[in-house]
């Protein structure tokens, strides 16, 4: 697959409904209110799609839904009806018997021009209706992405909120021994598949972050033994230094409009937070203290910035206006707080907390209230948000393990999942939804 098709797969979506069923009197269709917090996973039947790779597509869809913690795919051995014609209405009674609250059917076929056509229908067996249906045309190599898009459509139809399955994660791939650890910038699908290396591992890389356009990544590299923030074009592989500062620059992150990069600049024993306009290359200093100010993160509207500072004696989370005014501490619990990152929804700030010899991933409101710990372990760090603000990814170094691994967890704290990668992984950053 070319670099371009990796990020910009051509997809054409067409609505797909069964008129005879859709035209029946509307009953109350099944929904799942995820705003209530911990919910019982909904039993859903995802049938094998028709076609040569249909079973593979449905397997990815079921895996996406199950990993969200909101759905419980029913074992196929329990299915009574074997779907032979996905265009026809299923025998709803057969699916009600096994308590399938929702049913997914579909087909994958190849067009005369070589394109792949994937179609699905989502049914409510208890209402006896089709809920939605679509078909997609794309290149055959993009079949996994189509599966993620279908899973997103199902997620949105039932929960009323955007999904997060058609996304990428950029992270630091770690291989080799602890004494000779090789760290490369890498990118993958959110479920750990389609991993691709972006750097060759000759230089240490840290803290990669996506641009809002998904086409650029900013990160820190020790190229030429000089710590610098770089900007990498994902399609071309071209990279450039963001600014030429006398000290070390680190913890870069884009502004929501993609026009600026905010980062820390270390000079002498302290570091402060700066922004750089990517067009004019002008810099603006936001903090000016004798402390270490780092890990800045914009609110989704770009009006405020959260950051980490030890100005009070140990690392804590602060919030300020985007121009540097109104700097206010918001964390007051036991221990120290670091790596704050604002939710895409704007309602929460995720963080790493160190207390009692352990590291936790938690969330709090932007005013510091409502602190909740989601997971605790020997060493958990680096939370990053899914674009719908419902799930976090982070990395964990277990005691005595060879290296860090990536995990995801939802806001209930109950649905923790290992994200399998071919190497160790750290510093994940979630992309916005693909287009």
UniProtKB/Swiss-Prot annotation:
Disordered: annotated span: 288-310
GO terms for cellular component: periplasmic space
Keyword annotations: Cell cycle, Cell division, Periplasm, Signal
Subcellular location: Periplasm
GO biological process, one term: cell division
Superkingdom per UniProt: Bacteria
Main subcellular localisation: periplasm
Signal peptide: 1-28
Entry-linked InterPro entries: 6-blade_b-propeller_TolB-like, PD40, Tol-Pal_TolB, TolB_N
Protein function: Part of the Tol-Pal system, which plays a role in outer membrane invagination during cell division and is important for maintaining outer membrane integrity.
Family: Belongs to the TolB family.
NCBIfam families (alphabetical): propeller_TolB (TIGR02800)
HAMAP family: TolB
Quaternary structure annotation from Swiss-Prot or TrEMBL: The Tol-Pal system is composed of five core proteins: the inner membrane proteins TolA, TolQ and TolR, the periplasmic protein TolB and the outer membrane protein Pal. They form a network linking the inner and outer membranes and the peptidoglycan layer.
Protein name in UniProt: Tol-Pal system protein TolB
Species in which this protein is naturally found: Rhizobium johnstonii (strain DSM 114642 / LMG 32736 / 3841)
């Amino acid at each position: 697959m070319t670099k371009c098709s990796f990020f910009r797969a051509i997809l054409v979506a067409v609505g797909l409904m069964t008129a005879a069923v859709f035209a029946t009197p509307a009953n109350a269709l099944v929904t799942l209110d995820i705003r209530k917090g911990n919910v019982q996973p909904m039993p859903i039947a995802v049938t094998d799609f028709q076609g040569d790779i249909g079973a593979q597509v449905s397997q990815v869809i079921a895996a996406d839904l199950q990993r969200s913690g909101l759905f419980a795919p029913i074992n196929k051995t329990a299915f009574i009806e074997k779907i032979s014609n996905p265009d026809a209405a299923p025998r709803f009674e057969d699916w009600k018997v096994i308590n399938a609250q929702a049913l997914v059917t579909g087909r994958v076929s190849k067009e005369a021009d070589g394109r792949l056509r994937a179609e699905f229908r989502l049914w409510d067996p208890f209402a006896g209706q089709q809920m939605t249906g679509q078909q997609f045309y794309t290149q055959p190599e993009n079949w996994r992405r189509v599966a993620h898009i279908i899973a997103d459509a199902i997620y949105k139809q039932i929960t009323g909120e955007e999904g997060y399955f058609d996304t990428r994660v950029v992270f630091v791939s770690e291989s080799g021994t602890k004494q000779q650890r090789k760290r490369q910038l890498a990118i993958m699908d959110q479920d750990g598949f389609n991993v691709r290396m972006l750097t060759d591992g000759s230089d240490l890389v840290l803290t990669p972050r996506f641009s809002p356009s998904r086409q650029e990544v900013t990160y820190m590299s020790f190229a030429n033994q000089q710590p610098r923030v770089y900007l990498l074009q994902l399609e071309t592989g071209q990279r450039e230094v963001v600014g030429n500062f006398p000290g070390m620059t680190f913890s870069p992150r884009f502004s929501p409009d993609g026009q600026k990069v905010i980062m820390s600049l270390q000079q002498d024993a302290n570091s402060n937070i700066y922004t750089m306009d990517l067009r004019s290359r002008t810099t603006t200093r936001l903090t000016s203290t004798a402390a270490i100010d780092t890990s800045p993160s914009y609110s989704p509207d770009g009006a405020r910035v959260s950051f980490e500072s030890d100005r009070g004696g140990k690392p804590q989370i602060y919030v300020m206006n985007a121009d540097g005014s109104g700097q206010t501490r918001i964390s007051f619990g036991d221990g120290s707080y670091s790596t704050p990152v604002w939710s895409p929804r704007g309602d929460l700030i995720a963080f790493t907390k160190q207390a009692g010899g352990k590291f936790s991933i938690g969330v709090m409101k932007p005013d510091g209230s409502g602190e909740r710990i989601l997971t605790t372990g020997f060493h958990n760090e680096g939370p990053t948000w899914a674009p719908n603000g419902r799930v976090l990814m982070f990395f964990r170094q277990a005691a005595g393990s060879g290296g860090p691994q990536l995990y995801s967890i939802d806001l209930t704290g109950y649905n923790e999942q290992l994200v399998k990668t071919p190497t160790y992984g750290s510093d994940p950053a979630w992309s916005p939804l693909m287009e």
